[in-house]
Regions:
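Non-catalytic terminal extensions that flank enzyme cores
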Residues: 1-21, 39, 44, 71, ...
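N-terminal Rossmann-like or analogous alpha/beta NTP/dinucleotide-binding catalytic cores
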Residues: 2-124, 128, 219-220, 224-237, ...
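Noncatalytic linker/hinge segments flanking ATPase motor cores
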Residues: 23, 86-91, 152-156, 200-205, ...
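Sparse recognition of residues in long alpha-helices and their boundaries
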Residues: 49, 80, 244, 268-269
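Alpha-helix initiation and N-capping motif
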Residues: 61, 94, 117-120, 132, ...
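Alpha-helix boundary recognition
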Residues: 102-106, 208, 269, 282
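Active-site cores that bind ATP or allylic diphosphates and position pyrophosphate for catalysis
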Residues: 118-257, 264-268, 317-320
């Protein structure tokens, strides 16, 4: 695998999952990613994270491209535009992921796991900060005979072993962050039982080969970073910097989701201009003093992570 160019230039990325129409939370994160890269004279790559192709029909990928372009959040390569570091759709990258996966296997770090999600929850195992169960190591030391017996009844998923080690990094928005791989994360999935590669491996491989130097994403993924930094190290790849932006909540304090039709861009485009939406989001995230209409370009010169809140952002009543 050849990594993309890292010649001092900042390369950010949009990495949406096309499981539905974009909502305001997706758009806010995309705006911050775009502004952070462009304020440093950088570029943006669009990667479509459709690992689970059945849940991510191509029509949604096409629509999110239209929505981003309509807002003025134009990317420099990727998506249907193409470029030198494709494929840009994760559903087309299984062979690329396999090569890197085999490197981890060769290090003796990958093992089969036969545990079901129901079994893990029933075991009352502790949870990570993003809600996932911290794996208790049930299948970590199975013998070859035990593995062969379990395979007769069930196809395994595959996990990577983690050490009892702290990973510390400086987040561009949230500041210093530390997680213990074993205590706070646990051995984590690399590949599902149906053969689909897991998010943690796919994003590491893709960001490296696309030359991404800066990852901006929602704070719900902050706890994934230690796991990904561990994979960068194991695979000998250059890790990017990270900035995790606060999530956007509705006026009642609930996290927005693609099921919230009122906050989807499909509906918002009928009520507001692109400049009005950008201006309102910029106001909510502290980038301008009033919710006045503006373009993304007009925000570049004044952008600073110091202006962005550290806590989740609750939409003021009546803003949208």
């Amino acid at each position: 695998m050849e990594a993309g160019p890292v010649s001092g230039a900042v390369v950010g990325r949009f990495a949406p999952s096309p499981s539905g129409r974009l909502h305001l939370g997706n758009l806010a994160c995309s705006l911050l990613a775009w502004l952070s890269a462009k304020s440093q004279g950088g570029r943006i790559v669009l990667r479509i994270e459709d690992l689970d192709a059945e849940r991510c029909p191509r029509i949604y990928a096409d629509l999110l491209e239209q929505d981003l372009a309509w807002l003025g959040l134009v990317w420099d390569e990727g998506g249907s535009t193409g470029g030198p570091h494709g494929p840009y759709y994760q559903s087309e990258c299984a062979d690329i992921y396999t090569v890197q996966y085999k490197k981890l296997e060769a290090q003796g770090l990958v093992y089969p796991c036969f545990c079901s999600r129901a079994q893990l929850h029933a075991a009352s195992a502790p949870h990570t900060s993003d809600g996932n169960v911290i794996y208790p190591g049930t299948c970590r030391d199975l013998t070859a005979a035990q593995i062969a017996e379990k395979r007769k009844k069930k196809a395994p998923a595959y996990r990577v072993r983690v050490p009892d080690e702290e990973i510390t990094f400086l987040d561009g928005c949230m500041g210093p962050h530390t997680e213990n791989l074993l205590r706070d994360c646990g051995d984590f999935y690399l590949r599902r039982a149906d053969g689909v590669f897991a998010y943690q491996l796919a994003v590491v491989v893709d960001d490296a080969r696309m030359g991404v130097t800066e990852v901006v994403r929602g704070s719900d993924l902050l706890s994934s970073t230690a796991r990904q930094l561990y994979l960068y190290r194991l695979l000998g790849l250059q890790a990017p910097t990270f900035a995790h932006c606060p999530l956007l909540l509705d006026p009642d304090g609930r996290r927005l989701s693609k099921r919230d039709g009122d906050q989807s861009l499909e509906n918002l485009r009928e009520k507001y201009t692109a400049q009005e939406i950008v201006g309102k989001l910029a106001y909510a995230y502290g980038l301008q003093p009033e919710p006045a209409p503006c373009t993304p370009e007009s925000l570049i010169s004044g952008f600073s992570w110091a202006k962005v809140p550290k806590q989740d952002v609750c939409l003021p009543e009546g803003l949208f």
